[in-house]
Design a protein with these regions (language model features):
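Short hydrophobic alpha-helical membrane-embedded segments
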Residues: 9-12, 102-103, 124-133, 340
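Alpha-helical transmembrane segments and their helix-start/interface "positive-inside/aromatic belt" motifs
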Residues: 29-41, 174-186, 401-406, 482-490
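N-terminal signal-anchor/start-transfer transmembrane helix
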Residues: 9-27, 249-252, 256
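Short phosphate-coordinating micro-motif centered on Lys-Gly-acidic
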Residues: 154
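Cytoplasmic/organellar membrane-interface segments at the starts of transmembrane helices
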Residues: 271, 401-403, 458-524
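Transmembrane helix-loop-helix hairpins at membrane boundaries of multipass inner-membrane proteins
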Residues: 1-5, 23-114, 118-128, 209-211, ...
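Hydrophobic transmembrane alpha-helices and their helix-loop junctions in integral membrane proteins
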Residues: 111-117, 135-147, 161-463
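Hydrophobic alpha-helical membrane-insertion segments
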Residues: 37-57, 183-199, 408-415, 452, ...
Length: 524
């Protein structure tokens, strides 16, 4: 097994949380610095993973080609007559689909910790919950056992509920409850399908006996299907189709995909800035990651049937999100709806079932994480100074806050997809993949309207806030401080680096994506 680096990067925040709980509440500075050190250590560990990553290993369904594997028997219960042996493994590993998400989670968690420096209310509680949330997010991207995946998935629910419900805005309770109900509903769908797949998948033990398993890789291989399993690929039925829809819906709520999106604007508007950064930067990606990791390889025949519908919902997300963003007068709500729109590009790329399109989709997941995190930080900077997010309340800030204006311009142009910035590459790959498939070409053509609408609402927002005469009310607003530089400079650097040298990320993904496409389109 070697050094358990995946366990370390996943559970290090839990260790930090335990230490924080034993610290006196008066030591708020110590709590903040400890949290920052923990999340910075995660960034270092993620970089170590990337530096030692083997680009030629595929992963996806082959355990031997996953990297940094940690696997041992975690739960083993025998003697239950109707269940037989219950076997659950502690099984972690990464491939080209999960590695970019591990890196993204580490980076965004560190940036969000910096953004949390202004938190003064119940500092111990905030950072303890934040670090617990961090472990849940990281665990989702490294777990290869469905039961373990589900534990990490659920682990995020309560911390996020309390982080919004306690430290949020005026309507924080409503937003937190709405988030909780939507996410819990999705979790119920995922749980039901997980149980069905468990009783439809067997694994051969050392003594030759077969037992049911939660192993995700075993679920992808038809050779492990139980002939009489309700969701067995050897026993095709409408139940497999229903299970696919239920599982997809469970993940779609987190994306969020229209019409499951209504919790997101409320959660973003009421959440404190660091939690909006985490929500947009990482949590939304978990939905599309779950579809790629579980739906696609376990139900390949249904994925092929529904690719047109996935593309259609991607198009709806793109255009609907952009149109609603165009109508917003609240800066934060505008960015929230722009997230709905940009996650539509991920769905469109995934729907193409091509290596180009899915590479673009995963790259878009990473790029959206960094760009949208930067956008929410930008909203937080101006709100901390002016205590308003009304787009029509400002004007002429470019002369008063020139450095801030520069960072806003970078983030806005990256969101639009300007060449030399990371968003351009991922969106180009998405459309190349979608245009290459006859059945979804019309959908891809209509979806390009989202690019035009995105440019409209971003440039109009830029004009309203930063150009024209300066509102005298804001004549004394200070420009960025050192902490804000530390938050924004790394994200801007990543945006330009991946825009100029996208191969740094695409090379990590490509082998795994090719293998996934082969599995979904041709089978094992």
């Amino acid at each position: 097994m070697g050094f358990p680096i995946l366990s370390l990067i996943t559970f290090l925040p839990i260790l930090g949380m335990i230490i924080i709980l034993f610290l006196p509440k008066e030591q708020s500075k110590t709590v903040k610095w400890l949290s920052l050190a923990i999340t910075f250590a995660q960034v270092i560990l993620a970089c170590v993973l990337l530096a030692n990553y083997n680009y030629n290993a595929a992963g996806v369904f082959d355990e031997k080609s996953f990297q940094f594997i940690e696997k041992f028997r975690w739960i083993n219960i025998t003697g239950i007559s109707w269940l037989g042996t219950v076997k659950i493994d502690y099984f972690l590993g990464i491939d080209g689909i999960s590695t970019p998400m591990v890196l993204l989670t580490a980076i965004i968690s560190f940036i969000a910790t910096l953004s949390s420096w202004s938190i003064e209310k119940s500092v111990k509680g905030f950072f303890a919950l934040f670090l617990l949330l961090d472990t849940g997010m990281m665990g989702v991207f490294v777990a290869l056992d469905f039961f373990l995946f589900y534990i990490f998935w659920e682990l995020m629910l309560l911390p996020m509920y309390f982080l919004i419900g306690i430290w949020g805005g005026p309507r924080k309770e409503y937003a937190a409850i709405k988030f909780f109900i939507y996410t819990l509903l999705g979790s119920v769908f995922i749980l039901l399908v997980m149980i069905g797949l468990y009783f439809s998948t067997t694994e051969t033990m050392a003594d030759g006996t077969k037992v049911f398993t939660f192993n995700l890789l075993a679920m992808m291989n038809p050779a492990n299907s139980a002939p009489d399993g309700i969701l067995s690929i050897l026993n095709p039925s409408n139940l497999r189709f229903i299970a696919y829809i239920a599982l997809f819906a469970g993940f779609a709520i987190k994306i969020p995909m229209f019409p499951f999106h209504t919790w997101l604007p409320d959660a973003h508007v009421e959440a404190p800035t660091p939690i909006s950064v985490i929500l947009a930067g990482v949590l939304l990606k978990m939905g599309t990651y779950g579809i790629l990791r579980i739906n696609y390889p376990i139900f390949p025949e249904i994925t092929r049937q529904l690719m047109w519908w996935i593309a259609l919902f991607g198009m709806i997300n793109i255009i609907y999100g952009a149109l609603v963003a165009l109508a917003q007068k609240d800066f934060k709500k505008l960015i929230a709806y722009s997230s709905v729109s940009h996650m539509g590009y991920v769905l469109l790329g995934m729907a193409s079932l091509t290596a180009t399109g899915i590479n673009g989709a995963i790259f878009q997941m990473f790029n959206h994480g960094t760009i949208t995190a930067m956008l929410f930080l930008i909203v937080g900077v101006i709100y901390d100074r002016a205590h308003t997010r009304g787009l029509n309340d400002f004007g002429g800030l470019a002369t008063q806050m020139p450095v801030y204006t520069g960072f806003v311009t970078v983030a806005f142009f990256a969101a639009i997809g300007l060449p030399s910035m990371s968003g351009f590459i991922s969106e180009t790959f998405v459309f190349l993949g979608a245009f290459s498939i006859n059945s979804i070409r019309i959908i891809a053509i209509v979806s390009t309207l989202g690019i035009l609408l995105g440019a409209c609402y971003m440039l109009w927002t830029l004009q309203r806030i930063f150009f024209g005469p300066l509102n005298e009310k804001w004549a004394t607003l200070p420009d960025l401080d050192k902490r804000e530089y530390a938050m924004l400079v790394p994200l801007a650097a990543i945006i330009f680096f991946l825009g100029i040298y996208p191969s740094a990320m695409i090379n990590v993904m490509n082998k795994s994506v090719n293998t996934l496409v082969m599995l979904v389109t041709k089978g094992l």
